[in-house]
From Swiss-Prot:
Classification via InterPro entries: Glyco_hydro_1, Glyco_hydro_1_N_CS, Glycoside_hydrolase_SF
Example of a GO MF term: fibroblast growth factor receptor binding
Post-translation changes: N-glycosylated.
Region spans: Glycosyl hydrolase-1 1: 59-508
Factors inducing expression: Down-regulated by angiotensin II and iron overload (at protein level). Down-regulated by acute inflammatory stress, and in models for long-term hypertension, diabetes mellitus and chronic renal failure.
Stretches of the chain found on the membrane's Cytoplasmic side: 1005-1014
Name of the protein in its database record: Klotho
Glycosylation, residue list: 161, 285, 346, 609, 614, 696
Assembly description: Homodimer. Interacts with FGF23 and FGFR1.
Enzyme class: hydrolase
Naturally occurring in which organism (per UniProt): Rattus norvegicus
Length: 1014
């Protein structure tokens, strides 16, 4: 056996290089797994791509165990008692007593009788009167079920002069009583030492925070608080929102103390605030942490900013914007003790310098990152120059991700967050509630999807109070306070009930009704697609000129007509139309069983009557429906649909009042008769009127439209049904109307009222009583509006029951509120505020994607009109025309069809069909399953998803057995003669066979005989 060769040794230099490369890869991998400080600029690129629909909507998940659920308040905003028990004056007492501080947008409060009430106060002298209502406030906390309560101590209440002299015992007793009550409830306090209310004596003596000496006085005040309250407090905030204190207190003068100094003074004040904070943190860390075991930080406010364009320059400007607001204070504390480079480069002559010892003193002086995010800074007090020409955005999730990357993954406690409503809004604060939902949802996504370490959330605020420069013109509380009342009772708003339920669930846990359902529809379920107006193109694909031509090959090189020679004309065929076959091919690719489209009344009858009938167009429609039948696709044809121009009516009818004219109803019946005669042999599903726009239609027009529908229905029922055996109805748009505040009875009443006006107006006469809804009539009478016509008894009988099925179009869900919040979206006529849940997914056209709304609409229709056969004759969404994947449509179709399945399987709705909207972008841009450009149709990816649902007849899970449905074959409409005469045909066939056989035998033997005699 030969000896084994010794192993080859790698050169020493190569080993060193490989080792270096390995270490480099490990380093790069580590940086990818956890970005180093200062990497916040990556955030914009990370969120630049639009997320998949599943990640854009509501995330059904819960917060980590031990998550801190808090609510907050500030002393000056809520305490009142400005002269009680020895309290000293603060800069806000002085500032608000000056007329300049009265907000210009203070609301005029009206009594129930309509008379104006006395004007609201313009100061915080009484505010919510928390100083005299400790038990009331803490009962509010108990109702909410929070784990933590953030409040601030009034410096001037415990030290009236601001300096460490004899403290105010009554002030100390008030806070001790509050802390004791919190302990009884099991609620942990989060205490802010300074929330903008500096003792006026310190402002007068030292010039406020512009004097560096104030840092020492702040340290003394903090030491007093730590000594008296520290045993019960585990979370301390030194200063709230130093940006606002420095910039708007001492530079712009918009807030107390109202110093309109230079920007240099603003930067100097911020410098002193940072030193003051660091002194207090060092004091606690050295003298109190060992025995009290608490944590100390500073509450930093911030906005979020997005680039106008995704370029390096605009991203740098966004980074600079955050540096100038949040980084101004966060970088010295959380990184290196110094200001951001962008500030130092741009403000070299204005920005004070830290000494090296001060940098070391400030650096690391926070035990967690306390974040304030809300309207006060983000959208009201952000200086325009600090946006750097970029765009503000209320995206808390992206800000949390930026902080996580920029400041080395700190623990983040959101210590202030919320929104606001108008000062006239009472307890149904839907806008605030949905912003609260949005921010909490974004916090959850930051935790679960982005890995950000968010440890707590604080809703702002516990109760309505004095809102700084806005006075009482807005409200931010979870509890309503009547500032003109004596007792100042706290009344829970819808937002409080929502927050209480959310805390109880620890987030948004998956619910059974949110889970997709596995199952199938019945075998005869109609799977369709919609194209509101098919392209009527009567161009023939074959050469139809009857003349004969010769090719002049020697001279002109042209065709020369031969005079007197004409070819025989052939009968036209449907296959000659070049526009029909491509559309049939598209439908076959989708594998739909039904196709809905609308006829063009004005095209068929240009004059509105049968004195002039466009036979070419009528022949095209006849060919279209017959070819659909031959392709085993059932046509569903609408006689009329509102469209431009002239509402889709013949011009002659439009110029004479359109549907305002009762003659239009008679003309419609005449037009329907023509269509039934010409197309009824192939069409078995008719829609008289498709999606009449009830919101843009007068009551008189709706009255005539209902009679037109009924006339057409009875015409078909009496004259054509027996022979054609079709079905006919009207298709109404039924978008779901949901109460904005689910806890509000008034919102429920408003939602029902809007549904009756939107849907019941036309549905109740047909599917219900034969007359208009009582709700509608009563409301109009209250409004002294007597324009809604009355039906005669004969008309009621004519209209009632004029249907064979209930057809509805459904696209979205709308929230309604009775409180007037946004004048632009407020309907004074119905006294309803329309809005949307900002956590909902939206299309590019801002259509909300709310799948459960379809199920609710179907159940409401059954509740109102009984167990009728229903068809969803249109359901779809627009998409981004530039996106390769129409992922929104895939998500939309899948989830809406699944809700339809729930309605059928779980609720027992007699649902017979579903039609997706729409076939192509040709007639409705951005809404089709096919892109259309340069006369070419390109399928979008969503077609495969819809086709899969059709093939499965629903949703088949791993353990779901599909329902066996026998294959259906095309019915030959001309085969009846043969089916009924089988015996005769067999006999004739036998005779023909015998005759042919005899001829063959005669021919054979005659040939054989001739050969024999040759």
């Amino acid at each position: 056996m030969p000896a084994r060769a010794p192993p080859r040794r790698l050169p020493r230099l190569l080993l060193l290089r490989l080792l270096s490369l390995h270490l480099l890869l490990l380093t790069l991998r580590a940086r990818c797994l956890s970005a180093e400080p200062g990497q916040g600029a990556q955030t914009w690129a990370r969120f630049a791509r639009p997320p998949v629909p599943e990640a854009s909507g509501l995330l059904h998940d819960t917060f980590p165990d031990g998550f801190l659920w808090a609510v907050g308040s500030a002393a000056y905003q809520t305490e009142g008692g400005w002269r009680q028990h020895g309290k000293g004056a603060s800069i806000w007492d002085t500032f608000t007593h000056h007329p300049r501080a009265i907000p210009e947008d203070s609301p005029i409060v009206m009594a129930p009788s309509g008379a104006p009430l006395p004007p609201l106060p313009s100061t915080g002298d009484v505010a919510s009167d928390s100083y005299n209502n400790v038990y009331r406030d803490t009962e509010g906390l108990r109702e909410l079920g929070v784990t933590h309560y953030r409040f601030s101590i009034s410096w001037a209440r415990v030290l009236p002069n601001g300096t460490a002299g004899t403290p105010n015992r009554e002030g100390l007793r008030y806070y001790r009583r509050l802390l004791e009550r919190l302990r009884e409830l099991g609620v942990q306090p989060v205490v802010t030492l300074y929330h903008w209310d500096l003792p006026q004596r310190l402002q007068d003596t030292y010039g406020g925070w512009a004097n560096r000496a104030l840092a020492d006085h702040f340290r003394d005040y903090a030491e007093l608080c730590f000594r008296h309250f520290g045993g019960q407090v585990k979370y301390w905030i030194t200063i709230d929102n130093p940006y606002v204190v420095a910039w708007h207190g001492y530079a712009t003068g918009r807030l107390a103390p109202g110093v309109r100094g230079s920007s240099r003074l603003g930067y100097l004040v911020a410098h002193n605030l940072l030193l003051a904070h660091a002194k207090v943190w060092r004091l606690y860390n050295t003298s109190f942490r060992p025995t009290q075991g608490g944590r100390v930080s500073i509450a930093l406010g911030s906005h979020w900013i997005t680039p106008r364009r995704m370029t390096d320059y605009h991203i740098r400007e966004c980074q600079k914007s955050l540096d100038f607001v949040l980084g101004w204070f966060a970088k010295p504390i959380f990184i290196d003790g110094d200001y951001p480079k962008s500030m130092k480069n741009n403000l070299s002559s204005l920005l004070p310098d830290f000494t090296e010892s001060e940098k070391r003193f400030i650096r690391g002086t926070a035990d967690f990152f306390a974040l304030s995010f809300g309207p006060t800074l983000s959208f009201q007090l952000l200086d325009p120059s600090m946006k750097f020409r970029q765009l503000e955005s209320p995206s808390l999730r992206q800000l949390l991700s930026w902080i996580d990357l920029e400041y080395n993954h700190p623990q983040i406690f959101i210590v202030e967050n919320g929104w606001f409503v108008s000062g006239t809004t009472r307890r149904d604060d839907a806008k605030y509630m949905y912003y609260l939902k949005k921010f909490i949802m974004e916090s959850l996504k930051a935790i679960r999807l982005d890995g950000v370490d968010v440890i707590g959330y604080t809703a702002w605020s516990l109760m309505d109070g004095f809102e700084w420069h806005r006075g009482y013109s807005i409200r931010r509380g979870l509890f309503y306070v009547d500032f003109l009342s004596q007792d100042k009772e706290l009344l829970p708003k819808s937002s409080a009930l929502f927050y209480q339920k959310l805390i109880e669930n620890n987030g948004f846990p998956p619910l059974p009704e949110n889970q997709p359902l596995e199952g199938t529809f019945p075998c005869d379920f109609a799977w369709g697609v919609v194209d509101n107006y098919i392209q009527v193109d009567p161009t023939l694909s074959q050469f139809t000129d009857p003349n004969v031509y010769l090719w002049d090959v020697h001279h002109s090189k042209r065709l020369i007509k031969v005079d007197g020679v004409v070819a025989k004309k052939r009968k036209p065929y449907c296959v000659d139309f070049s526009a029909i076959r491509p559309q049939i091919t598209l439908l076959r690719e989708m594998r739909v069983t039904h196709f809905r489209f609308s006829l063009d009344w004005a095209l068929i009858l240009p004059l509105g009557n049968q004195t002039q009938v466009n036979r070419t167009v009528l022949h095209f429609y006849r060919c279209m429906v017959s070819e659909l039948v031959h392709a085993n696709i059932t046509p569903v044809v609408a006689l009329w649909q509102p469209a431009t121009p002239h509402q889709g009516l013949p011009h002659a009818l439009a110029k004479h009042g359109a549907w305002e004219n009762p003659h239009t109803a008679l003309a419609f019946a005449d037009y329907a008769n023509l269509c039934f005669e010409e197309l009824g042999h192939w069409v078995k599903f008719w829609i008289t009127i498709n999606e009449p726009n009830s919101r843009n239609m007068t009551y008189r027009a709706g009255h005539h439209l209902l009679k037109a529908h009924a006339l057409a229905w009875h015409l078909y029922d009496d004259k054509f049904r027996a022979a054609q055996k079709g079905k006919i109805s009207i298709a109404l748009q039924v978008d779901w109307i949901e109460p904005a505040c689910p806890f509000s009875q008034k919102d429920k009443e408003v939602a029902e009222r809007v549904l009756e006006f939107d849907v019941g107006w036309l549905a109740e006469p047909i599917f219900g009583s034969g007359d208009y809804p009582h709700v509608m009539r009563e409301w109009l009478n209250q409004k002294n509006n007597f324009l809604l016509p009355y039906f005669t008894e004969d008309e009621k009988k004519l209209i009632r029951g004029s249907f064979d099925f209930l057809a509805l179009s459904h696209y979205t869900t709308i929230l309604v509120d009775w409180e007037k919040e946004d004048p632009i979206k407020y309907n004074d006529y119905l006294e309803v505020q329309e809005m949307t849940d900002i956590t909902w997914l939206n299309s590019p056209n801002q259509v909300a994607v709310v799948p459960w709304g379809l199920r609710k609409a179907l159940n409401w229709l059954r509740f109102k009109y009984g167990d009728l056969p229903m068809f969803v004759t249109a359901n779809g969404i627009d998409d981004d025309p530039h996106a390769e994947q129409d992922s929104l449509r895939m998500y939309y179709i899948k989830n809406y069809v699944n809700e339809a399945l729930k309605a059928y399987v779980l609720d027992g709705i007699n649902l017979c069909g579903y039609f997706a909207y729409s076939l192509s972008d040709r007639s409705v841009p951005k809404s089709g399953f096919y892109r259309y450009a340069a006369n070419q149709f390109e399928p979008k990816p969503s077609i495969k998803h819809y086709r899969k649902i059709i093939d499965n007849n629903g949703f088949l899970g791993s353990g779901t057995l599909g329902r066996f449905c026998p294959e259906e074959y095309t019915v030959c409409t001309g085969c009846g003669f043969f089916q009924t005469r089988k015996s005769l045909l067999a006999f004739i066939s036998f005779l023909v066979f015998a005759f042919v056989t005899s001829l063959a035998l005669i021919y054979y033997y005659s040939k054989k005989g001739r050969r024999r005699y040759k």
